[in-house]
Amino acid sequence: MSLFTIGDLHLCLGAPDKTMSVFTGWQNYQERLEKNWLENVTEDDTIVLAGDISWGMSLQQAAPDFHFIEKLPGQKIILKGNHDYWWTTLKKMEGFLADEGCSSIKILHNNHYQYGDYGICGTRGWVNMPGEVQDEKVLRREVQRLETSIQSAVKAGLEPIVFMHYPPIFATNFNYDILEILYRYKIKDCYYGHVHGRSAHELCVTNTYDDVNFHLIAGDYLQFIPQKVI
């Protein structure tokens, strides 16, 4: 039994015009993902999908992508990315997944999931650069969601592992509000996606910074091979 993760699947079975195959490093990405998933992940495993899961604009349009994920082995825990336009209220999403028979997909949102002695925690996050007032409102909300998730794991006596969509650090841009939460709760590992392309990957923190181990898990960076966490 193992824990895996990968971000940015960008599935488009319900919106084929949104395929990422036109970009360098993304050729046949859905087929490669399926092959690598089947070779590495078993039914006894859990895998965290760190946002940008489907290009569907609604739950209905994203349904083929959920069914694709459902058929793959393992328990799946999903969190929101900036391109998950289908995302709606937790009640609606859980009801939709239940109606579609997607029983292996769980949603990480203001909560945690236990994995052994660990708590799987996380949220989408937000951009690192100073923005408009609206950006500040979104950032404050994301900071609260991250802390709520981590606190729920700590209260359960678990060691939190954090998964996010946006990177807390990118190039010379630091999201100090997010980092403060990671430092306060002494988070050892933070996994994130969002960043695409070799030149951008080179600007990411992929080592230990201020006692936090940062891991880039964007699909193209991992060559669509799920990364083992535990």
State each model region's role.
Residues 9-14, 40, 88-174, 181:
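Conserved catalytic scaffold of divalent metal-dependent phosphoesterases
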Residues 2, 15-115, 176-186, 210-218:
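Core catalytic region of metal-dependent phosphoesterases/phosphodiesterases
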Residues 77, 168-230:
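Conserved beta-sheet core of the metallophosphoesterase superfamily
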Residues 1-3, 229-230:
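Short, Lys/Arg-enriched, disordered terminal segments
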Residues 3, 46, 118-119, 159-161, ...:
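Structural motif
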Residues 7-11, 51-54, 82-84, 111, ...:
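Active-site metal-binding loops of divalent metal-dependent hydrolases
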Residues 81, 91-99, 125-133, 194-213:
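Short secondary-structure transition/capping segments
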